[in-house]
A protein has these predicted regions:
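Charge-dense, low-complexity intrinsically disordered segments
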Residues: 2, 6, 48-51, 103
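A solvent-exposed, acidic/Ser-Thr-rich amphipathic alpha-helical stretch
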Residues: 28-94
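Short, low-complexity N-terminal intrinsically disordered segments enriched in polar/charged residues
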Residues: 1-37
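Intrinsically disordered/low-complexity terminal segments and short unstructured peptides
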Residues: 2, 39, 118-120
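A beta-strand edge to alpha-helix "cap/lid" segment located at domain peripheries
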Residues: 65-144
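Intrinsically disordered, low-complexity regions enriched in Ser/Pro/Gly/Gln/His and often acidic
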Residues: 21-22, 53, 115-119
């Protein structure tokens, strides 16, 4: 590993942490800044999840997170595979959250799979696929 790759790893990790902060603070402009303008985002493995363009998913998240009073995304175990100005990135996530009208905490976890590209303004995700592995106390289960 050379010093350039170490710097790239730090910058990509910072991008992932900015993603988490954007979701948890409901800053959808900041969330958009993590992605290229033509990025695709796939949350279809999550309960009631969707996939679409960056802007379509930002609008959906803004609507969906109106029902989330607090969330905290932890991103860890980041793995990188570089090929020139591109990188495949896998990172685990753990997300406790509180939904409107629910007294108990909900939690979920899984993996983020990013296809990242180096741009003039830093590393950006051009494709995100969320691999949702588990969800405890889903608000959707409350409808049963």
């Amino acid at each position: 590993v050379n010093t350039s790759e170490i710097a790239d790893r730090f910058e990509i990790a910072d991008t992932l942490y900015r993603y988490a902060r954007a979701v948890d603070t409901k800053d959808w402009d900041l969330w958009r800044s993590v992605f290229t303008a033509d990025a695709t985002v796939d949350y279809s493995s999550a309960p009631a999840g969707r996939s679409g363009s960056r802007d379509e998913i930002a609008a959906w998240l803004e609507e969906s997170f109106a029902f989330v009073t607090v969330s905290q995304h932890f991103i860890t175990n980041i793995e990188y595979s570089f090929e020139g100005d591109r990188a495949q990135v896998r990172a685990m996530f753990y997300n406790p959250m509180q939904f409107v009208g629910m007294t108990e905490l909900s939690t979920c976890g899984g993996n983020y799979h990013h296809s990242m590209v180096r741009t003039e303004t830093g590393w950006r995700s051009e494709r995100l696929h969320e691999e949702s592995l588990w969800f405890v106390n889903s608000p959707l289960a409350q409808d049963d």
